[in-house]
């Protein structure tokens, strides 16, 4: 292949590294209203009185909106970017009189500049009726304090939700008699694991610009992963027709799932729709830390039974998830905690997976890379590591005895057959590359330091089966180059480049001959958006099929120009030729002919959805140096092997893997969202919220052990999310080998390690 599976430079690389104006605030008019939000200091309260009279007198203030400007009995909406009907409940209003977490919106202010808006905000007087708050998610279910007592709360999908019980979702699934199987096992590992909420912490915070166009429509330019879902969300929130809204995205400075939720778009949209004036909102880092959509905190109870030879016979998993004040992504993230961890163990005779998602008066959780699988894999993989230790079996060996293989039906994965899998090769590659036999389990380095190793494996999905869709539109232009229009959002991942590579491979042209446009609800074909590890697999397949259709049309027109039957010509990349090569029509000639007196449009549009979601696989091993006296733990080496099918662009795939590994290490060791006894988030800046920098980590090495997925473009599967999952169990197991103490809660802090070392 000439372009696919080749390390091509990103199409936008030079513009980004040279600091060209490509992000939202770079490209919008600066003469617009500045929108800011007054937020509640209380975790649960009713706004009794709000006085904005003095604030409205501040010069430059255009408008201040409160709950009085929003129909409190109107239909609610969700900010979750999901295909309709969304599993997430409709539990929000633009401004609600009932504030449900410390940071919830009390008022929207709009003015000519930040100075006047900040001054006006200080002059607003609010009197609250402070209510008891649900701050412990263990006590949320059936608590007498209801987070959502309102009657206009609504759940569109059958996810087991009940707002009168603080229940956002409940589900049960299983196969076989799990109790009988566990009773017959030689050994059962039974533990409860706890993963904290953690922030996506993308460099570009939430931001949106809104204006009214010449047709009176609301135009929205937003840093979002989900332009089409965002249009529906805004229509639902503002109670206006979707036809009156256009949503587009510029370049995005990172998302990691945070921008799969419309966190900020509704507020400038509300202002602009009311005032008919352009407006923008840019969240500060403080706001992005205290009023965003962090990963769901989860508690996972695992019972895992096996034979004395280490064959896993049964897995019983119960997950309790804290969705916070609103239910965005609550019903769906929790499912992945079981359905993306249990299927790795193909010899299990029985499984049971039960989950509850509860409301609390914490900041609303949301989507974050890994989307629930991360939490579930930490628990299940940690249990398998403990099983290996208890039986005296090497962790790699016990997995080789249990893993699923190509052609196996995957347990807890909706009956799907494993259509492509190199998990066995991934295990061997990581085992060899890290020098496992020489380093396992721990080595004393002297001076109070030890080096230990740990490992884990992971899977994810490739899109959402039979739900989300990807689309592509492709046309040839008058000089013989192509324009690819997509609705997927490149958020720094390089999907514009990858999708162009797929088109270029089919059309046998240089990558530079394919220009990419997207995403824009007015001009792009419908696409669910960039999430659920779907872009390469789902949208990429649409691009491949679209390019094939366009190539066929080009051959039809070329054959007509040559006076030949369509079956007598061949496509040669830059031309259509007769089979013997004696006659030739160039792409430029064919494109020009299609634009003069032609009834044939040299354009193709394809929408694609997959009935299966083939999982990518990954194995990772961490070498961690631990100072037993100070508790400092540093990952000095991380080895990973990934099966993502055919890597369309190995360089970009490797960058994805390295970044995900770094995020996973942060979740294992430092990242944590905590609250004080009033429900106020404590880590409100990047000084308190510690994300690892590149120099905090030693050597990261990634290899690809490729299977071939026949349903993907050129054999490709996803890679975006699976890469974050292995560091959690791997680092935790390495620290166990260093300290001889198991940790069942993340992050594992320096203080905890120091105490264990003593």
What are the residue ranges of the model-derived segments?
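Catalytic phosphate/nucleotide-handling subdomain of diverse soluble enzymes
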Residues: 462-524, 539
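Glycine-rich loop/linker segments at domain edges
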Residues: 6, 12-18, 82-85, 161-208, ...
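Flexible, low-hydrophobicity surface segments
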Residues: 1-160, 274, 595
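Helix-loop-helix junctions that connect adjacent transmembrane helices in secondary transporters/permeases
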Residues: 147-238, 403-481, 606, 611, ...
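Short acidic, glycine/serine/threonine-rich loops at helix termini
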Residues: 74-79, 120-123, 222, 231-233, ...
């Amino acid at each position: 292949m000439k372009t696919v599976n080749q390390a091509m430079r990103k199409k936008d690389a030079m513009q980004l590294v040279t600091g060209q104006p490509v992000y939202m605030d770079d490209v919008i008019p600066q003469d617009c209203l500045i929108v800011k939000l007054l937020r509640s200091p209380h975790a649960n309260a009713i706004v009794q009185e709000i006085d904005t009279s003095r604030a409205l007198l501040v010069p430059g203030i255009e408008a201040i909106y409160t709950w009085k400007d929003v129909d409190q009995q109107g239909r609610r909406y969700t900010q979750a970017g999901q295909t309709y009907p969304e599993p997430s409940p409709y539990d929000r209003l633009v401004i609600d009189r009932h504030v449900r977490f410390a940071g919830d919106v009390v008022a929207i202010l709009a003015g000519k500049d930040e100075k006047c808006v900040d001054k006006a905000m200080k002059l607003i007087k609010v009197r609250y009726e402070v209510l008891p708050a649900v701050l412990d998610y263990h006590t949320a279910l059936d608590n007498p304090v209801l987070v959502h007592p309102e009657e206009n709360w609504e759940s569109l999908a059958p996810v087991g939700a009940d707002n009168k019980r603080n229940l956002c979702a409940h589900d049960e699934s299983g196969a076989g008699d799990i109790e009988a199987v566990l009773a017959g096992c030689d050994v059962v590992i039974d533990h409860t694991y706890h993963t904290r909420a953690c922030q996506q912490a993308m460099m570009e915070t939430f931001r949106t610009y809104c204006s009214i166009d010449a047709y009176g429509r609301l135009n929205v330019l937003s840093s979002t992963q989900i332009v089409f879902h965002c249009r529906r969300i805004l229509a639902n929130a503002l109670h206006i027709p979707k036809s009156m809204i256009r949503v587009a995205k510029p370049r995005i400075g990172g998302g990691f799932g945070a921008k799969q939720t419309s966190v900020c778009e509704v507020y400038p949209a509300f202002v602009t729709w009311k005032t008919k004036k352009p407006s923008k909102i840019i969240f500060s880092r403080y706001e992005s830390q205290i009023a965003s959509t962090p990963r769901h905190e989860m508690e996972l109870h695992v019972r895992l039974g096996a034979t004395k030879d280490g064959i896993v016979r049964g897995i019983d998993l119960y997950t309790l998830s804290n969705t916070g004040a609103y239910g965005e992504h609550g019903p769906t993230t929790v499912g992945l905690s079981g359905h993306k961890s249990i299927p790795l163990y193909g010899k299990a005779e029985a499984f049971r997976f039960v989950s509850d998602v509860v409301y609390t008066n914490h900041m609303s959780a949301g989507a974050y890379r890994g989307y629930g699988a991360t939490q579930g894999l930490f628990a299940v993989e940690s249990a398998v590591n403990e099983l290996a230790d208890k039986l005296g079996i090497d962790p790699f060996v016990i997995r080789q005895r249990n893993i699923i293989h190509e052609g196996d039906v995957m347990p807890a994965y909706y009956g799907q057959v494993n259509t492509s899998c190199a998990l066995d090769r991934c295990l061997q590659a990581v085992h060899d590359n890290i020098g496992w036999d020489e380093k396992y389990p721990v080595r004393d380095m002297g001076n109070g330091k030890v080096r230990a190793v740990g490992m884990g494996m992971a899977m994810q999905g490739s899109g959402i089966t039979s739900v989300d869709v990807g689309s592509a539109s492709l046309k040839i232009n008058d000089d013989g180059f192509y324009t690819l229009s997509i609705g997927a959002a490149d958020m720094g991942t390089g999907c514009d480049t990858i999708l162009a590579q797929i088109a270029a491979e089919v059309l046998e042209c240089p990558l530079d001959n394919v220009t990419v446009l997207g995403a824009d609800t007015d001009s792009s074909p419908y696409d669910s958006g960039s999430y659920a590890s779907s872009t390469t697999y789902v949208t990429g397949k649409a691009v491949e099929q679209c390019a094939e259709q366009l190539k066929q049309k080009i051959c039809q027109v070329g054959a007509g120009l040559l006076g030949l039957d369509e079956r007598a010509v061949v496509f040669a990349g830059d031309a259509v030729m007769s089979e013997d090569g004696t006659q030739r029509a160039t792409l430029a000639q064919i494109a020009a002919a299609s634009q003069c007196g032609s009834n044939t449009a040299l354009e193709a549009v394809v929408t694609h959805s997959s009935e299966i979601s083939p999982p990518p696989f990954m194995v990772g091993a961490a070498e961690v140096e631990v100072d037993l006296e100070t508790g400092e733990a540093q990952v000095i080496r991380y080895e990973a092997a990934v099966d993502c099918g055919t890597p369309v662009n190995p360089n970009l795939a490797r960058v994805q893997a390295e970044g995900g590994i770094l995020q996973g290490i942060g979740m294992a060791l430092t990242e944590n969202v905590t609250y004080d006894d009033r429900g106020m988030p404590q880590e409100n800046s990047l000084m308190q919220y510690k994300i690892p920098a590149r120099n905090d980590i030693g050597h990261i090495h990634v290899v690809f052990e490729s299977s071939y997925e026949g349903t993907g473009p050129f054999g490709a599967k996803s890679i975006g999310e699976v890469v974050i999952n292995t560091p959690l169990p791997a680092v935790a197991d390495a620290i166990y080998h260093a300290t001889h103490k198991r940790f069942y809660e993340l992050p594992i802090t320096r203080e905890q390690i120091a105490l264990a070392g003593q």
